[in-house]
Amino acid sequence: MHIAKLAEKITGKPFYDGLTPRMTEEELETAVEFINEHFVFLESKDGGMATIDSVIDRTKQAVMRLGVRGLLIDPYNYIEQSGQEEHSGISHMLSKITSFAKAHGIHVWFVAHPQKMYPREDGTYSVPKGMNISGSAAWFAKADLGITVHRTDECVEIHCWKSRFKWVGQQGVSALSYDLPTGRYEQFTPRVELPSSLKGSQRDWSDFDDL
């Protein structure tokens, strides 16, 4: 499933049949070659829950043997907390992974989901940020960079709510469009509608055919 999703993003075409023409076998083969050259999937072979120590150990081997420079953990709650209280377990996990990342010069991404959000009086929801991530405020305190992918009816908003180092980025928001068949994002272009007072006054250009 992960390979299929990555192949869609690489080729810009869907993996499965649908309204949008799917990728060809040749395009899939090229995408898989790229994935094999740039990605390593760390899975628990015995089917058990991973611990942060087992993740670090396997990542260390990938760094030393394959030159891996980044680690994506999605989602974080698949990592067992070894009986610790959730807040303490998350704080301990983040401290360990931060020390490991600095020691080996790699970047680590965590995918985490917010706690239950409640609607405002107008029925809309506020954008979840670091303090709203389920489990612990340590997500905000210990992250170097934090972003939220927030979907609205019109677009997808990317909110940067923390950037520890100014040369990496700054707080702000950017609007993108999401292409469902391929999983790609692109710059959002708002739809512009004419005021109702002008809609009936548009000229039919066929009137000028004889000019």
Report residues per predicted region:
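Structural recognition of the conserved hydrophobic beta-strand(s) that form the central parallel beta-sheet
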Residues: 72-73, 106-113
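Walker A/P-loop NTP-binding active-site region of P-loop NTPases
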Residues: 1-18, 75-80, 142-144
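Hydrophobic/aromatic beta-strand patches that form the interior of the parallel beta-sheet core
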Residues: 40-42, 109, 145-147
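C-terminal regions of RecA-like/P-loop NTPase motor modules
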Residues: 13, 17-18, 32-34, 49-68, ...
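Short, ordered loop/turn segments at secondary-structure junctions
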Residues: 76, 113-114, 151-152
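Phosphate-binding/switch loop-helix module in NTP-utilizing enzymes
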Residues: 40-103
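Nucleotide-state-sensitive switch-loop elements of NTP-binding domains
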Residues: 9-43
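Conserved protein kinase catalytic core
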Residues: 2, 80-81, 119, 168
